[in-house]
């Protein structure tokens, strides 16, 4: 079950961090070492132009923003990149870890960080739900919808640990929780 830490952010003491490891489940590999991170209220929902604010923060910390959209409503994972999903509008329930996995609610202002191999899927969402998707500098993402091949499993293990936390750079909790 998730572990909760308060105030992981050097910049905003209201942030609450949840972190948890997901074991391999069904056909989804998940990540063997790095936990999923959920920053509750990473940025205040009242922040003007929250999508742009998230993009600026992610870009500044070496996680270039790649797109704005919803989340796919089918189970998938990425074998070649870690992923940050910054909720700038609406709310949703996600399924993490694969079919029958953990249901996690996210809302405006939250930041979810998924290590390579972590299954995720949209279960339900408000009509206005939108996220910014970002990946560590130099990591190109793929979309995997079936059990990993030996090459994909090796790729997941080979994706390098980011040098910075997407929210707080070198001072952020990812740097401590994602140990090499």
Regions found by a protein language model. Give the residues of each.
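Double-stranded beta-helix
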Residues: 64, 70, 89-91, 99, 123-180, ...
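Short, surface-exposed beta-strand-loop junctions and turns on beta-sheet-rich folds
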Residues: 100-102, 128
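Conserved metal-binding segment of the jelly-roll/cupin
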Residues: 106-126, 135
């Amino acid at each position: 079950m998730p572990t909760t830490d308060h105030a992981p952010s050097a910049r905003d003491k209201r942030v609450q961090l949840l972190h948890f490891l997901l074991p391999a489940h069904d056909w989804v590999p998940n990540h063997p070492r790095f936990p999923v991170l959920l920053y509750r209220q990473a940025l205040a929902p009242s922040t003007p132009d929250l999508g742009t604010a998230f993009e600026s923060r992610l870009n500044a910390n070496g996680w270039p923003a790649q797109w704005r959209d919803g989340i796919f409503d089918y189970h998938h994972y990425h074998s070649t990149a870690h992923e940050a999903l910054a909720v700038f509008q609406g709310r949703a329930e996600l399924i993490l870890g694969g079919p029958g996995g953990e249901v996690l609610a996210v809302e405006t202002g939250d930041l979810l960080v998924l290590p390579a191999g972590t299954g995720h899927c949209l279960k339900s969402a408000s009509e206005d739900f939108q996220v910014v998707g970002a990946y560590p500098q130099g990591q190109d993402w793929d979309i995997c919808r079936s059990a990993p091949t030996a090459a994909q499993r090796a790729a997941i293990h080979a994706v390098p640990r980011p040098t910075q936390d997407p929210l707080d750079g070198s001072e952020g909790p990812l740097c401590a929780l994602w140990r090499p």
